[in-house]
A protein has these predicted regions:
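Alpha-helical membrane insertion/targeting regions
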Residues: 2-270
Length: 270
């Protein structure tokens, strides 16, 4: 008579209850992890900046910053809701709620396009009008902002590309679709990670830590899929094919004389 262990060994991974449970809830975990990362980064940072605004030490937040924050927060909440609906078997509600992503994703991209030059203009104007004793410090801040623009450009382009690929695959490859949506959301998370002060960072000297923490955030889903499937899912291959070259460009241009001289001109400053 076969033992219980023999039966378990002969069963497929989907026949094991725990495996099936993790299959459903790993995406909820990833969405919740992204929400927690965002809150850990932005809440303390925002409180400090609000205090600086109230003390007259920095310019008020531009309206587009509030718009972008609300849109990104809505996207994260939508992701958490959508993954929970699928984990609990409510696919019909998932499909209906998914319509919101068709509005949110373009709005996030557009607000980001407006936000980047708006924030750069604030730093540029502050540096230009700074008193002599603060001029050097302000120029250093402007150089950092110029480098950060590289991460923002990468995030905007890759977020748009990944969402497009995910939406295109939603009816023909649900596995690719759900993973690519997670991967799309992962792309802009360095903005949160870099604000978590109790983490070790290489910023602003190098974006290496931002990229390593991004991969660390991805690891639970990636490792589970590797165990579960016994191979690297196509969604990761496509994502890395986009993310890796873009990251190489970011690292090559970071703090380079060419980028520091060219970037202001792209935004109309010289």
């Amino acid at each position: 008579m076969a033992s219980a262990a023999d039966s378990l060994a002969g069963a497929s991974k989907t026949d094991v209850p725990l495996v099936g449970w993790i299959d459903r809830w790993i995406y909820v975990f990833m969405a919740a992890l992204f929400v927690a990362t965002t809150l850990a980064g932005f809440i303390p940072d925002s409180l400090v900046k609000i205090a600086s605004v109230e003390a007259g030490q920095r310019a008020p937040f531009p309206p587009v910053l509030h718009v972008h924050a609300v849109l990104m927060g809505s996207w994260l909440m939508l992701l958490l809701a959508q993954t929970t609906l699928m984990a609990t078997g409510n696919s019909a509600h998932h499909q209906k709620l998914g319509i919101a992503s068709f509005l949110l994703a373009p709005a996030i991209i557009i607000s980001g396009i407006v936000l980047v030059p708006t924030m750069y203009a604030q730093v540029w104007n502050a540096a230009a009008s700074a008193p002599p004793e603060m001029a050097e410090q302000m120029r250093g801040g402007l150089a950092i902002r110029t480098d950060i623009m590289l991460l923002q450009l990468r995030a905007g382009v890759l977020f748009a590309a990944c969402v497009f690929l995910a939406v295109r695959a939603r009816r023909v490859d649900s596995g690719f679709h759900k993973r690519m949506i997670i991967l799309a959301t992962l792309v802009p998370l360095p903005a949160s990670i870099d604000r978590i002060t109790w983490l070790q960072h290489t910023m602003p000297q190098s974006p290496l830590s931002a990229d390593l923490y991004t991969l660390l955030l991805l690891s639970p889903m990636f490792v589970w899929d590797l165990f579960r499937l016994g191979r690297i899912h196509r969604a990761y291959i496509v994502w890395f094919a986009l993310w890796l070259p873009a990251s190489v460009v970011v690292h090559q241009l970071w703090s380079s004389d060419w980028w520091q001289a060219t970037a202001p001109g792209l935004l109309g400053y010289s």
